[in-house]
C-alpha cells in the first residue's frame, strides 16, 4: 500500500511539473493574486477531472483530444511568451509618458490579457492534458481512484502556487529582465508541448 501511495505521489509531482513551470513564468510576468487563486484552483480541479475523463474516454479519444488540446495550449503559450518578450524589451528601453499614462502604469491598472476565465481554462488545460492520458492507467493501480485523483489535484495545485511564489520572488530580483526570462520560459514550454 505504501509503495502504491509513493508511486501516486511521484506521478502527481511529474504531472504537476508543467503547472509549476507555467506558473513560475507567469509569476515572473507578475499577475494579480486573484488570478493566481483562480489558476491554482483550475489546475487542481483539472488534475482531478482529467484522469477521470481519461479513464472513461478510452485510448483513441484521449489521443485525439490530447494532440489538439496540447497544440492549442502551445499556441496560447507562444502568444503569451511573445507578448512578455515584447513587453520586457520595451520596459528596458527608456520611455516617456504623459501624466495620465504614468499614473495608470504606476497604479498597476494596465489590463492583462491573462485575466479572463477563458485564458485560465486554456492554460489550465494545457498543463493538465498529460493527466488525461494517465487516466487510462488508473484502473491498473490498486488504490481507490478517487483518492488517487484527489492527491493528483492537490499536488498540482500546490506546485502551481509554489511556481507563482517563486516567479514573484525572481521577478522582484531581476526587474524588467524578468519579463524577458518569463517569455523565454513560456516559449520553451510551448515548444515542449508541440514536440
From Swiss-Prot:
GO cellular component: plasma membrane
InterPro entries cross-referenced by the UniProt entry: Mntp/YtaF, Put_MntP
Residues spanning the membrane: 4-24, 39-59, 64-84, 120-140, 145-165, 175-195
Membrane topology, record value: Multi-pass membrane protein
Keywords: Cell membrane, Ion transport, Manganese, Membrane, Transmembrane, Transmembrane helix, Transport
MF GO annotations: manganese ion transmembrane transporter activity
Annotated PANTHER family: MANGANESE EFFLUX PUMP MNTP-RELATED
Name of protein: Putative manganese efflux pump MntP
Record organism: Syntrophomonas wolfei subsp. wolfei (strain DSM 2245B / Goettingen)
Gene this chain is encoded by: mntP
